[in-house]
């Protein structure tokens, strides 16, 4: 999938920053344009894209680093949870995390949100490592990860809010000298950005689109749906936009549309599994005497969940369950306050937490009378994942050159030309229309 990965508008903006650093030694101290306007703070994306291009002058080099970030994310997550999950549950973790079409889609091409999976796993690991006592390096890495993630994508606010709630509920302790030093070290890339803001304040003041709380009106259900869909085969956006004309050598009249229909119907039903798992995770077993009325019952249930189910348990497994609940609450808060409509990539930093309810629910089922059925369904799910991944690798817009639509953000008209397109093998892989009046152009790439 890395070899077949293509570049669109966002990728060209990122590659322009990395290429200018690798080829011309020019450091761009700010990131890609944001959906709310302005530029992302800090030049960490320039470094993340530029360093791989120094080793391999190809547009797929940064995607290799993205894949390494995802490998490290899974290794860190599995290492953190191996003492708290049964062997079969670790197999489910591999099935639902590593072989997940959502995860492998984000793991194999260049994009800002694709780096965030690692910071999500780092967040869980560093918090769990301080469940009983504060430690220097976990606190250092916890805060450093938050600050670096902030410079990559603003959706890191999900982890920031989760950290605050975890700390308030005493899910982890903080080694304050380590936390402060971690924040200062990770903030070093912000110094050139701050100097640039003084000279060109428009990169900050341009961020005026949307309004605080828009998510409560438009996007909260979307955010919750993505939380559930991350642990399923119910994909969205362009993951099911299949077109195999490039492979078939002609038009694709039935295979792509047929798989799209299958993905939106049969595979879409797999979201029922994470829905049931999340309902079980939030279940309150003991009924409390409450006053009549729906509002009173809802309030009593909320208090019971918060007081009983979100306090740290005596076991690591109870801690993990509480961590997942708090991440979900953090998602509700941030999605509600979001100034823009919640999109699928804005929640992937919580991907590691979103898949855990199914692991914690299906794992114990394998030790009951439903064991044979659970194993059988897991094998069916594995086959469906592998087939779906092959279809994504050969049929979706990010992994094919032919059959693009205008809304795909691929191969649209470019206003100028640049040596970058040939040095990074972009034109050799999938050529773009160049020197078209009225076309688009990467924000920092000089023409010519």
Which residue stretches match the model-derived regions?
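Extracytosolic helix-loop segments that constitute the early lumenal/periplasmic catalytic or substrate-binding loops
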Residues: 12-47, 55, 214-218
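Transmembrane-helix motifs of polytopic, lipid-linked glycan transferases
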Residues: 64-85, 122, 272-277
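Membrane-interface transmembrane helices that cradle and orient dolichyl/undecaprenyl
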Residues: 84-87, 121-141, 149
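Short helix- or helix-capping micro-motifs
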Residues: 93-99, 146, 150
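Short acidic/glycine- and proline-prone juxtamembrane loop motifs at membrane-interface regions
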Residues: 102-115
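Hydrophobic/aromatic-rich transmembrane helices and adjacent perimembrane loops
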Residues: 106-107, 158, 321-370
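Transmembrane-lumen/periplasm boundary regions of multi-pass, lipid-linked membrane glycan transferases
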Residues: 160-273, 278-281
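Signature aromatic-anchored transmembrane alpha helix within multi-pass, membrane-resident enzymes
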Residues: 183, 187, 362-400
